[in-house]
A protein has these predicted regions:
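Extended alpha-helical targeting/anchoring segments
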Residues: 1-386
Length: 386
């Protein structure tokens, strides 16, 4: 089975791409830009296209970007489809049980190593990640449904082939392009949702007032502006939104936006902005060298990009966080989590922040119709009604 599911903003609903045509797979870095050129032309010819680019495809666009080597996962995978239809989520709400590959002490030790690099002036920030793994009994549709019900996102995607499935409820836009207009929306800054309204508002205000999170967000925003500026028309870049807070059932997130105009190809855009600065650190080249040294495993699709092209060329890619890779042959799953490390980072707090991003796997996505009574107050309204 080959299929793709995406959120269609025009229909304001999830849609499934059907009637697959050709599939393009890259295991060699030189093939990645070629495939991007091919699928961009396919969309202009009236086909739908969906696929992913792995984090380790970075050197396809810039040999200075270092990373570990992927083994079984493609560097890029895209399929053409002839049509779309509405997609229905399942009601299955079973928790997904995965465990960290590394011990907590290993993550904390890596944070301390990064702080050494920061003290020496090698970098300003490094995005450190780890993996959760486990055997899988849930179906791909059930997993995707759980993730999307728990964390609804306009950037959610499901990709499935005979050998793998990828379920993403990413809240982060990598870039979208419609006509000449291109937008990126880097995300930096996370807080857990509170158990009750007062705690939730406290966590929200803490994120809103955090100088550390704002500094991180601004640092990454500057990198994104620089990356995007290379492929945008002179004078067209703007920053319409700074430090916006977005609520999800398990976390608060902080984003900023950059918008510009471009006439560059899809491959040229990727060569300038991939991987997204929010999942590497600053400066990107040195941060990725440190990531390759400290992280125990390749990232694969996690922190890469998943996306689609519609007939006519409208394009959207997410930053593939909150994303599960399922090996259908080995019947196991991998889910990445991470945190941005800066000079004043507290190792224990960074570990807690990264683990908070895994709550989507077990947080109950209760349908509202099960509630017979709900507390309402004029000041607070109904807590978590959104």
């Amino acid at each position: 089975m080959i299929r793709a599911v995406f959120f269609d903003s025009n229909a304001n609903d999830l849609m499934e791409m059907i009637n697959p045509a050709r599939t393009y797979v890259a295991f060699d870095r030189k093939e990645v830009p070629q495939i991007l050129d091919i699928v961009e032309n396919s969309s202009k010819e009236g086909l739908y296209v969906a696929g992913f680019v792995s984090y380790e495809a970075a050197s396809s666009f810039d040999l200075a970007l270092k990373h570990q080597q992927l083994q079984d996962t493609p560097l890029a995978w895209f399929t053409e489809f002839r049509a779309i239809r509405p997609f229905e989520l399942t009601e299955n709400d079973d928790a997904i049980e995965l465990s960290p590959v590394a011990e907590a002490e290993d993550f904390i030790s890596s944070v301390l190593r990064i702080k050494d690099f920061l003290e020496r002036g090698d970098v300003y920030q490094v995005n450190l990640t780890q993996k959760l793994v486990g055997d899988l009994k849930n179906s791909t549709t059930d997993i995707f449904s759980r993730l999307v019900r728990t964390q609804p996102s306009p950037y959610a995607m499901l990709l499935e082939s005979d050998g793998f499935s990828i379920c993403s409820a990413s809240p982060e836009l990598f870039f979208s392009k419609k006509g000449k207009i291109i937008e990126m929306q880097p995300m930096k800054g996370t807080r857990e949702r509170g158990r009750f309204n007062e705690e939730d508002q406290k966590n929200k205000e803490d994120l809103k007032a955090s100088e550390k999170d704002r500094a991180e967000n601004l640092m990454i925003l500057d990198m994104v502006r620089n990356d995007l500026g290379k492929v945008c028309l002179p004078g067209s870049l703007s920053t319409p939104a700074l430090f916006e807070l977005h609520s999800f059932p398990t976390v608060w997130q902080q984003t900023s936006s950059v918008v510009g105009e471009t006439v560059c190809s899809l491959a040229e855009i990727f060569s300038s902005v991939f991987p997204c600065a929010s999942v590497t650190g600053a400066p990107k080249v040195r941060a990725m060298e440190i990531i390759a040294e400290l992280e125990q495993h390749p990232r694969g699709v996690y922190t890469g990009a998943m996306g689609y092209l519609k007939p006519g060329g409208e394009t959207l890619f997410n930053v593939s966080i909150r994303t599960m890779y399922i090996d259908k042959v080995k019947k196991n799953a991998t889910y990445g989590i991470g945190s941005g490390i800066v000079w004043d980072s507290d190792p224990e707090a960074e570990l807690a922040e990264s683990l908070a991003k895994a709550k989507i796997l077990s947080f109950p996505s209760l349908p509202f119709e099960l509630f017979e009574t709900m507390k309402y107050t004029p000041r607070e309204g109904i807590y978590l009604i959104e």
